[in-house]
Amino acid sequence: MRRPLEVKLCPNIYMVKDTGVKILGSSLKNRNILLAISGGIAATESVKLSRELRRYQADVTIMMSKEAEKIITPLAVSWASDNEVVTDWNSKMHQLDSYDAVIVAPATRNTISKHIHGIMDSPIMMALSAARGKDTPILFIPSMHKDLFDDPVTQDLISILISQGSEVLLEEENENKIKQPSPLHIVAKLCNMVNKKLPNRKKVAITLGANRAPIDAVRAIQNASSGQTGWIISEYLYRQGHDIVCIVGKTTVHPNFPLPDVRFGGSPESMLSTCFGVASDKIPPEAWIHAAAVLDYYMHPEDGKKSSGSENWEITLSPGPKHILELSPLVKGSIRIGFKLETGVSDQDLIDKAFEQISKYGLDAVIANMKEQVHDPNFPRGRVVRPDGSVKLLETYEILCAEVDSIISNS
């Protein structure tokens, strides 16, 4: 899977040696992670997975089963993790160390069965038993042929794992196999598992992308928005342990990994209706981020297709409902962050308009942007304006995301 957004997050951090990695975030900084590699063919993905863990600053300990060594060498995994690999019993007994989380990838049915039945015939199995005893988060990544996965015994084993408090991450069937998810997806899931224990984690709804409205049966008008900023914020907050609901319009950029709760609403009406549905959830969001480019003006579409011709076609656009205003009665007490995009105005005018939006809708903050500056690396990524009149420059996406997280977590 491509990673179109990574350079903008940490642009000034580079590799300094052959085993080095580009740092993309700090979601696993100072976290001790055990990666247990069992003997599935997906063990070949261990190099990529180890390096992805390190991109988020995890301290990675690797254990490999004897079967895994038949598929990939400890030397390759040691290079990827920049650490020694435990392949057999030794006096250091790393399997009894304390870890912030354990990943079993790939998790063969044999390994899952042994863990459930308490068999400790290898360092990996002892480490898993100790982790369960310490209530350490464990993430299993089953990978096997579809026929084996569909065996009722396998399904029972997975159900037992979940009932014991472990988490299981599955990829959709591909080539009649349940393959291992991408390293990006696995590490994002792990970040969420580890960081959800941090204080003040919240359910956060974020609108993103553009609205489109028809003017006849084949033509439409649409705001300019790729959805990039919304996806970046969503991924960051998910990694930080928040429960994220994405309300998505029309986008040209896609997330780097599947987020767990994505709901769609491309037109202004359908996006607002989806927002109403989210606000009415049994457990409603405690925070809202209004990052979508909502279509403020649109029309009732003409019937059929207007015939092509040389004459002018005059249309009348009428103002639509303001989503932030319409949602207000349903989200009282929630943290709310708006976005303000302007063009051709001074910095002070932009800030004044952002502060006006805060005052008008009772927002906790507004991220203010100049259209001419959004994609220009010579300008900051935005400015955050607060109700007290303070303004803070946001130089990078990483700083923008961290500021949004701070507002949500500390309000």
Protein language model features and the residues they cover:
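A cross-family phosphate/adenosyl-ligand binding-site feature
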Residues: 2-411
